[in-house]
Amino acid sequence: MNRDNMDTTKRKEDHTKHTTDVIEFYEEGTAASSLNIATEKANSSPSILRRIINRAAWLSKKVDAMGVESTGIQRISPYERGTSKKQFLHVAGLWLSATGGLSSMSSFLLGPLLFGLSFRESLASSLISVTIGCLIAAYCSIMGPQSGCRQMVTARYLFGWWFVKLVALASIIGVMGWSVVNSVVGGEMLAAISNDKVPLWVGIVIVTVCSFLVAIFGIKQVIKVETYLSVPVLTAFLLLYISSSDKYSFVNAYVSKGNLDSSTRKGNWMSFFSLCYSITATWGSITADYYILFPEDTPYIQIFCLTFFGTFLPTCFVGILGLLLASVAMSYKPWSVEYDSHGMGGLLWAGFQRWNGFGKFCVVVLVFSLVSNNIINTYSAAFSIQLSSVFCAKIPRWFWSIVCTIICLVCALIGRNHFSTILGNFLPMIGYWISMYFILLFEENLVFRRFFLHLYTKEFPTVTGEINGPELVGSSKEVEKDAVTNIHLLKRKHKVTKHRYNWDKWEDYEVLTHGYAATFAFIVGVAGVVVGMAQAYWIGPIAAKFGEYGGDVAMWLSMAFSGVVYPPCRYLELRKFGR
């Protein structure tokens, strides 16, 4: 018995030593290590190339020394995570700051201003759709603590090693699209309060650069800054409710555009519904990123509720205010002029205008809500880029944050005079892919990881002896019954875990699914998008049945199409390949 204890102690010491080595490796920075290797290989290269590589290696070491997060898409193991209850408060502050800002409000403005809906019509459409979007984002977030992986890394268990790159690309477009919108809005606000002394392009540069300076440092700093920003930002929005209240009598003066027939109004209502759904559902592509430091056994219900209420309450708080301001602008000429001249920034300044200098100060505070939203977008987009190839994964995250910032800045400068067009026509497309991703994840967890776990013979290979960890018996038909028995034992041993994944295999190409079923279901879902979308450049045959401009139902059709196709395809895939 003493010998067994000695063996156990030795294994623990070896495991601890290995863990220490891994942590030290990441603290030194994977980027610097990669560049040092490249330096050795470049000894025979031209001197200019050697100097460039040496300079890059020196820069990488300097950046790591500043405390910049050097880890990329690597999984955070359970023993590397925190256990403090303050994590819940920090993440709650993050959601307050990120979702309770002008990026959320901007879409609500379009109900009256673009779609011609009354305040009541816009309110009903937006609240229902935002609730659905928050439910989807909250469900996606539960993958964070159990996996220790970024959201798009967990998608490898659905789409496989290769096809997940397409999903990562969609995620990049989504979060960077919002960053472009935020940068333009920030520029409009600074131009409005300065009477155009600060040009629009200068304001865009200021917002973009400020976002980058925080996002480059890593998740711990991002969460801290977001928490600190949430208090002044939400206070400023509360003051805007008060300052603009003297004009609320104009809200009901505007009913809806009289030249819209009943069918067209319904179509516009549906399109606005889809737009507001995208505001919160899009968070589903990155929500898990901010729970990877939570303990592995954190109850799912806690993560779900924290994400749902953390996104729902702030979004509704600023969204309803946006509807009030937009409805006033439709019937109150001075505010309408401000919106036509300076866009959303002018409308916000109009709401604060009676407070003069203090009102301008409040507008500047609101700009920080755009910065806080961009911080999250820039931080998470870098991981999706790393997921696109092995080469990109070797390049440090902070470098890709720089690339994302440059792309965002260029796109914002080019599209700065087409804000409503970008927001109304492009961003709803983001909700299409997240709808399909959600339904596939939901079915994978609810059906296959619950009732067909014995078919995952690659992920859970044959072992003998005591069940310890995620390893299960059952890699062939002869031992399938034993596999089912052992799975039941494992579930009783780990009662907290509802969905079974072998997260240690997150980068094992031989174990991860091929992704044939998910990819095929995704493609079928795209067919639903084509027939159901209503945008300026395309109105699908089903969407065209709702009035002159159509009604966007692409999210729901794509979700339905993918959800019907995936189960039979996934079952066949598991039977054929065991993964």
Swiss-Prot record:
One Gene Ontology term, aspect cellular component: plasma membrane
Membrane-topology descriptor: Multi-pass membrane protein
Single GO molecular function: transmembrane transporter activity
One Pfam family, short name: Transp_cyt_pur
InterPro entries found in the cross-reference section: NCS1, Pur-cyt_permease, Pur-cyt_permease_Fcy2/21/22
Alphabetical list of CDD domains matching this protein: SLC-NCS1sbd_CobB-like (cd11484)
Membrane-spanning segments: 99-119, 123-143, 158-178, 199-219, 222-242, 275-295, 303-323, 363-383, 395-415, 422-442, 520-540, 546-566
Keyword Transmembrane: yes
Keyword annotations of the record: Membrane, Transmembrane, Transmembrane helix, Transport
UniProt function note: Thiamine-regulated, high affinity import carrier of pyridoxine, pyridoxal and pyridoxamine.
Similarity field: Belongs to the purine-cytosine permease (2.A.39) family.
Stated name of the protein: Vitamin B6 transporter TPN1
Organism encoding this protein: Saccharomyces cerevisiae
Gene assigned in the entry: TPN1
